[in-house]
C-alpha cells in the first residue's frame, strides 16, 4: 500500500515545495485551457449562429481557436523548460540517493498526470463559467439582443480535452527524453555551470540592421491599401528577424562597450549587472526579443481593433450620408430620368416620403498616366499594364448642390483633386486639352468613396467639368477609345447615384428593396444604413472581441516570460550576490544593482516595441483604410487609439516590473547574521 502511494505523495510534495514555479505554470495551463474552450464554445454556439450576420463572427472565433492553440503550445513548452531547469539539481540528487532513471521517469509521469488533470478540470470549469459572460460581452459589442439561458458546448469540451491532453503528453515526452539523455552528475552540476562569454557576432548584427531597416522602409514607402495588405506579412517577418538579431548581437556589443568604460563599469551597482548579463546574454537576448515581439503584437492587435470598432459610426456617416443609397449604371436603356422615376414610384407605394435627397451623375474610367503626366486612353494598353490610374468626373451643377463653396468653370476648364501623382495645370485627356482652374482640397464626391481603397491604381483624379454636355461628350469618346479588341470589357462606367432618407421600419425597407430591385435594367448597387450598420458591428465587434482576447493571451505570455526569466536569473545570481555581500557589498548596493538590471531587462523590450509600432504606423493606417471608410479621421483616430493602448500597457508593464523586482531581490538578498551568535 505504501508503495502505491509513494509516488503520488512524492509528486504532490514536489509540486508544493516548488510552488514558486509550479503555481505560474498551472495558472498558464488553466488560463490557456479556459481561453481555448471559450473560443470553441463561441464558434459552435447555436444562439450566436441564429443571427444572420453572425457567420463571419463564428469564423473569426474558429480562427482565434487556431491562434490560441498554437500560442498555448509555445507558451506551455516555454514555461515547462524553466520549471525543469530549476528541478535538474533535485532530479540529480534523487539519482545519487539510489533512484534509477525509470523511477524518476515514473515520478515525472505521476506529476504530469496530476498537473494535467488539475489544469484540464480547473481550466474547463473556468471556461464554462466564463463562457456565458463572454457571450454576453460579444453580443453587446455586436449590438445583438442579449439572451438568457446557459449552455455547455460538448464539442468545445471534446476539442479542448483532446488538444491539451496531446499537448501535456508531448511535454511529458520531452521531459522524459531530456531525463534519459542526462547523467546524474550533469543534473547535479547543471545549476552551477556558467555560460562562456559570448563573442560579438558582427555578421549577425549587420543582418539585423539590414532586415530591420528594410522592414521599416517597406512599411513607410507603400502608397495604396492593397499594397500594404500585400507587403504587410513580409515587413513583419523582416522586423522579427531584425529584432532577434539586434538583441542577440547588438546587446553583447553594447555590454562589452560598457565594460570597456572603466569609470562606469567599476561601480558596485554596474559591475554585478553588466558582468552577469554579459555571461548569460545568449539566453537573455532571446527572452528580451520574445518579450519585445509579444509586446508589439499586443499593442498592434488591441489598438487596431479598438480603432476599427470605435470608428464604425463615423465610417457609416461618411460612407452613407443618407439612409438609402442607390447607384445605377446608365446606358441607352436606363437613363437617370428613368432611374429617378422608378425609385420615386416605389417610394410612393410605401406610403412614405423621400427626404434629404442627394443625387449626382459620375463618369469613371481607367487611364495610363505617362511620365509627362498625360492621360492616355487605350483599352489594350490598359489591360497589358499594371501602372494604371483612374479618373472620376462629375458636373459643376452636382458639385455645387452639396458643397458650401460653389465653383464656376468655363468651357475647357476643370476643378481637380488628385490622390497620388498630380496633374499638370494643362493636361491632355485623349484628344482633349483641359486647364485646371482650381485644385480642390478633398474629393468632390458627397460621401467617402470606399472603392478607391480596394483599387491598386497608382493615382486617382477627381475632375469637375462645367456641364452635363462635357461629361456626356467625355463618356462617348472614352467609351470608343477604351474599346478592347475582344470588346468584352466595359471600362468606362457612367453611373447615377440617388440617396435619400426614409423613415420606415426595417421590414418595410426590406420590402421596398425587394420590390424595386427587379425594375432596374442595368447593374446597380444598393445600401441601407440600418442593414450595413448590422454588418459593420458584426464584423468589427468580432474583430474587437478577438483582438482583446488575443491581446490578453499575448499579455499573459509576456508576463510569464518576464517572470520565469527573472526568477531563473535570480537563482542563478543568488550565489554571486551572496559572495559580494560577504566581501562588503551592502544591502543598499545590492538593491541598486538589482534595480539597474531589472530596468534594463524590462524597459528595453518595451521601448523597442513602441519604436516598432510607430515604425509600422503608416502601413497599418493604410490597412485600416480597407476597413475604416473614413479618410478624414483614420490617421488621427488611430494615433489616439495607439497612444491610449500604449499608456494602458505601460501601466501594466510597470506593475509587473515592481512585482518582479521585489521577487528577484528577495531571492538574491542574503540576510545579515544575528551578531549574538
PLM feature spans:
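Membrane-interface segments at loop-to-transmembrane junctions
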Residues: 150-151, 187-200, 270-278, 283, ...
Amino acid at each position: 500500500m505504501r508503495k502505491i502511494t509513494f509516488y503520488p505523495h512524492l509528486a504532490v510534495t514536489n509540486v508544493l515545495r516548488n510552488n514558486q514555479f509550479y503555481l505560474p505554470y498551472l495558472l498558464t495551463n488553466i488560463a490557456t485551457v479556459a481561453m481555448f474552450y471559450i473560443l470553441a464554445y463561441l464558434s459552435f454556439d447555436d444562439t450566436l449562429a441564429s443571427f444572420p450576420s453572425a457567420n463571419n463572427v463564428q469564423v473569426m472565433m474558429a480562427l482565434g481557436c487556431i491562434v490560441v492553440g498554437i500560442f498555448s503550445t509555445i507558451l506551455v513548452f516555454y514555461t515547462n523548460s524553466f520549471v525543469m531547469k530549476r528541478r535538474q539539481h533535485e532530479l540529480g540528487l534523487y539519482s545519487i540517493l539510489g533512484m534509477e532513471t525509470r523511477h524518476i521517469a515514473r515520478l515525472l509521469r505521476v506529476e504530469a498526470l496530476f498537473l494535467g488533470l488539475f489544469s484540464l478540470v480547473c481550466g474547463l470549469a473556468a471556461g464554462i463559467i466564463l463562457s456565458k459572460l463572454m457571450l454576453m460581452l460579444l453580443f453587446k459589442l455586436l449590438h445583438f439582443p442579449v439572451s438568457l439561458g446557459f449552455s455547455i458546448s460538448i464539442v468545445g469540451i471534446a476539442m479542448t480535452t483532446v488538444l491539451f491532453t496531446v499537448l501535456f503528453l508531448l511535454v511529458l515526452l520531452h521531459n522524459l527524453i531530456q531525463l534519459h539523455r542526462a547523467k546524474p552528475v550533469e543534473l547535479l552540476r547543471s545549476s552551477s555551470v556558467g555560460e562562456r562569454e559570448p563573442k560579438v557576432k558582427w555578421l549577425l548584427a549587420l543582418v539585423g540592421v539590414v532586415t530591420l531597416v528594410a522592414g521599416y522602409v517597406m512599411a513607410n514607402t507603400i502608397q495604396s491599401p492593397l499594397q500594404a495588405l500585400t507587403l504587410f506579412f513580409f515587413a513583419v517577418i523582416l522586423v522579427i528577424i531584425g529584432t532577434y538579431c539586434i538583441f542577440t548581437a547588438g546587446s553583447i556589443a553594447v555590454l562589452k562597450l560598457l565594460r570597456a568604460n572603466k569609470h562606469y563599469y567599476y561601480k558596485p551597482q554596474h559591475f554585478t549587472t553588466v558582468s552577469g548579463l554579459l555571461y548569460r546574454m545568449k539566453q537573455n537576448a532571446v527572452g528580451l526579443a520574445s518579450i519585445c515581439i509579444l509586446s508589439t503584437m499586443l499593442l498592434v492587435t488591441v489598438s487596431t481593433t479598438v480603432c476599427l470598432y470605435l470608428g464604425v459610426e463615423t465610417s457609416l456617416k461618411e460612407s452613407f450620408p443618407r439612409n438609402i443609397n442607390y447607384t445605377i449604371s446608365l446606358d441607352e436603356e436606363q437613363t437617370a430620368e428613368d432611374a429617378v422615376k422608378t425609385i420615386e414610384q416605389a417610394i410612393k407605394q410605401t406610403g412614405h416620403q423621400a427626404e434629404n435627397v442627394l443625387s449626382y451623375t459620375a463618369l469613371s474610367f481607367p487611364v495610363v498616366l505617362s511620365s509627362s503626366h498625360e492621360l492616355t486612353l487605350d483599352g489594350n494598353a490598359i489591360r497589358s499594364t499594371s501602372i494604371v490610374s483612374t479618373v472620376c468626373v462629375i458636373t459643376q451643377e452636382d458639385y455645387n448642390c452639396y458643397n458650401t463653396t460653389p465653383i464656376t468653370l468655363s468651357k475647357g476648364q476643370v476643378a481637380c483633386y488628385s490622390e497620388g501623382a498630380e496633374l499638370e495645370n494643362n493636361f491632355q485627356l485623349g484628344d482633349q486639352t483641359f486647364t485646371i482652374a482650381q485644385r480642390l482640397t478633398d474629393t468632390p464626391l458627397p460621401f467617402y468613396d470606399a472603392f478607391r481603397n480596394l483599387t491598386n491604381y497608382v493615382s486617382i483624379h477627381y475632375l469637375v467639368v462645367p456641364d452635363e454636355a462635357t461629361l456626356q461628350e467625355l463618356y462617348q469618346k472614352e467609351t470608343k477609345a477604351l474599346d478592347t479588341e475582344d470588346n468584352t470589357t466595359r471600362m468606362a462606367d457612367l453611373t447615377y447615384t440617388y440617396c435619400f432618407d426614409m423613415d420606415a421600419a426595417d421590414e418595410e425597407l426590406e420590402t421596398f428593396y425587394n420590390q424595386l430591385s427587379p425594375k432596374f435594367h442595368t447593374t446597380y448597387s444598393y445600401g441601407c444604413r440600418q442593414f450595413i450598420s448590422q454588418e459593420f458591428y458584426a464584423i468589427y465587434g468580432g474583430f474587437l472581441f478577438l483582438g482583446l482576447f488575443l491581446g490578453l493571451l499575448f499579455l499573459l505570455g509576456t508576463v510569464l516570460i518576464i517572470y520565469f526569466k527573472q526568477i531563473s536569473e535570480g537563482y542563478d545570481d543568488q550565489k554571486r550576490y551572496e559572495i559580494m555581500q560577504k566581501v562588503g557589498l551592502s544591502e543598499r548596493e545590492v538593491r541598486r544593482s538589482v534595480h539597474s538590471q531589472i530596468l534594463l531587462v524590462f524597459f528595453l523590450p518595451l521601448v523597442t516595441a513602441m519604436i516598432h509600432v510607430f515604425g509600422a504606423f503608416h502601413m497599418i493606417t493604410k490597412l485600416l483604410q480597407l476597413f475604416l471608410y473614413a479618410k478624414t479621421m483614420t490617421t488621427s483616430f488611430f494615433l489616439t487609439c495607439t497612444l491610449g493602448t500604449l499608456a494602458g500597457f505601460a501601466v501594466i508593464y510597470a506593475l509587473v516590473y515592481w512585482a518582479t523586482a521585489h521577487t528577484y531581490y528577495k531571492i538574491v538578498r542574503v540576510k545579515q547574521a544575528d551578531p549574538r551568535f
